[in-house]
Amino acid sequence: MTDEGLSREIRKWDLVALLINVTVGAGIFRLPADVQKTVGNYSLVAFVVCAVTVGMIALCFAEVGSRFSDTGGPYLYARETFGPTSAFLVGWLMWLTRVAGFATLAQVFVAYLGYFWPPAESGLPRITIIAALVVLLTVVNIMGVKQSARVGDIFTVSKLIPLVLFVAVGLFFISPARFTLAARPGLGSFSAAVFILIYVFSGFEAVLVNSGEIRQPRRVIPFALIVALSASVVLFLLIQVVCIGTLPNLAGSERPLAEASQSFLGTAGPLIMSAGALVGIFGTLNVIMLACTRLPFAMAVQGQLPVQLARVHRRFRTPHVSILVSATAVLLLALSGTFIYAVKVTVITRVIVYASTCVALPILRRRNQTATPVRTVGKR
């Protein structure tokens, strides 16, 4: 148990699973077409540039994260480095982004469910399904972080099975002729493609909010970040290779993985990919609920929100008040359908969060010369 009253139940591989869950989200089922439409086969080069960029950001998070063991993640890093005002801004923006992200994915979930059961996309069935998602994940989170972590483990494996199947089978059906490079894209188009990829890979910072519930966070966080993001980059790159090599009209595809899989898995392909999308979205929703509900708790512990939000359930050792408040906000936004405007703030928020953590690194190094489990390139 931590000084905050929380229980450290997230193990090393639990954290890896949670990070993969939030990184390999619903975007992977549309990403190949979006990137291909922007830069054609140079999308593979964009992946390499993105991998290097995300890798540098992740290493900054790994080193900074190895210096903290309490709940808060980037919010806590900003508070320690820049003071309470900047931290409050980072914390609130992160919370709003996660709430909007959950609302968005809940809508995507019912859209994919509509592939199997069309009534799910509108009316009372839609409302019931979204409410059931929120209630179920709220109950799981209140019952204990151990339960949430185990759910994350199960859905990470379930999410990866169809994607690994897609790659493992699809690689045998690719046509080398489809990898011919056309005219080199302009800097603007290439930058846009890299931005799309970086945005899709983002989200890992949210899981670090739960540092107060991670076992040996100073050592586990760097390991989990490097393993999870490396695995995600390789998986995304291989999926792009299969899509390019098996789907002639990739740039114009609305459901690239489903259409590509049909060419080598037959009619079962789209069903497997759609089911995989449902599983993947649910897993991501679980991670978002786990992360966003801890931010108000962390801010309350630091005295920046009402103290009631810092209450911990006596039996389950979870921040139940913060969970209920966040879940209520998620439910209202998801049911209102107006979330689409709120989602636009996520890009700005992530730039602020990434920048604040990267800038915090050299400052924290100067203040504290203690050796850390991981160290990025640069002078102390």
Q: What residues fall within each predicted segment?
A:
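Membrane-interface "cap" regions at the ends of multi-pass membrane proteins
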Residues: 1-33, 37-42, 46, 55, ...
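Helix-loop-helix junctions that connect adjacent transmembrane segments
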Residues: 2-6, 41-44, 120-128, 154-275
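Select subsegments of transmembrane alpha-helices in polytopic membrane proteins
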Residues: 14-19, 98-101, 316-325, 376-380
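Hydrophobic transmembrane alpha-helices that form the core helical bundles
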Residues: 33-38, 46, 55-134, 138-142, ...
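Juxtamembrane helix-boundary/capping and inter-helix hinge elements in multi-pass membrane proteins
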Residues: 38-41, 69-71, 80-86, 212-220, ...
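Generic alpha-helical transmembrane segments of integral inner-membrane proteins
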Residues: 48, 52-56, 92, 96, ...
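TM-loop-TM module centered on a large, flexible mid-protein loop between adjacent transmembrane helices
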Residues: 76-77, 83, 114-120, 194, ...
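C-terminal membrane-solvent junction of multi-pass transporters and transport-like membrane proteins
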Residues: 151, 184, 308-320, 354-380
